Amino acid sequence: AMDEQGDATQAVTCFTKMCDQGITALVGDVTTTPTLALAAESADYNMPMVTASATAEAVTYDAETDTVNENVFRATFTDPFQGIKMADYAYQRLGYTKAAVIFQKGADYNEGLAENFVNEFESLGGTIVDQETYSEGDVDYKTQLTTILGKAPEVVFCPNYYQEVGQILAQAESIGLAVPFLGGDGWDGLEGYATADQLKDAYFCANYAKGSNPDFENAYKA
């Protein structure tokens, strides 16, 4: 096992070192961008690779050539699935017709979910009143959030990782952006990064095995 620090270049370096050590299969990566780099690299070795959490469709399928990455396997859903389902939930289940989106630009995961949410929400008849982006490493989102506030959305889709989501929710609260936020599986891990008040009426899409925690399920249904 090696730590690639969430970086695509470092992931390939770690993979090369492990190949020199004689590995015959690869479990990983965790997030989308380094996994995409490893998918391409492992194909050159014809090495089996499985990821439990990278959701970009391109991890297992090359749309440009319409070919499946035959050595790469995924044990989770995809960005299109998440983005589409959250748009369906927002429009059909929650009844929202005006949405805004805030996401990190240049990030495969964030952009993938945002694109699919926007396309599905609009196809259902909803209106995307604003799309705001930020750069990797940013910690101040108030400018984007203030712009969103001025567009008066009923809901905000925030397909980012939990560290940034915690900051975004806190800053949204501080400027009075009091609408529900929705997200993807990158929100999983928010405990300790956001308060219960900030997460009121918030929803996100994540992996869950039905029947794995019957006590909780029964208590929730009750």
Each predicted region: which residue ranges?
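Conserved donor sugar-nucleotide recognition element shared by glycan-biosynthetic enzymes
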Residues: 7, 11, 79-83, 110-113, ...
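Extracellular/periplasmic ligand-binding modules, especially the Venus flytrap/periplasmic-binding
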Residues: 116-118, 165, 209-222
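Hydrophobic alpha-helical
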Residues: 32-43, 139-140, 149-175
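Extracytoplasmic ligand/sensor domains, especially the bilobed periplasmic-binding protein
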Residues: 23-132, 180-207
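Short beta->alpha junction loops
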Residues: 1-9, 130-140
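Mature extracellular/periplasmic domains of secretome proteins
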Residues: 15-20, 40-44, 146-149, 173-174, ...
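Short, well-structured alpha-helical segments in soluble
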Residues: 8-24, 89, 139-153
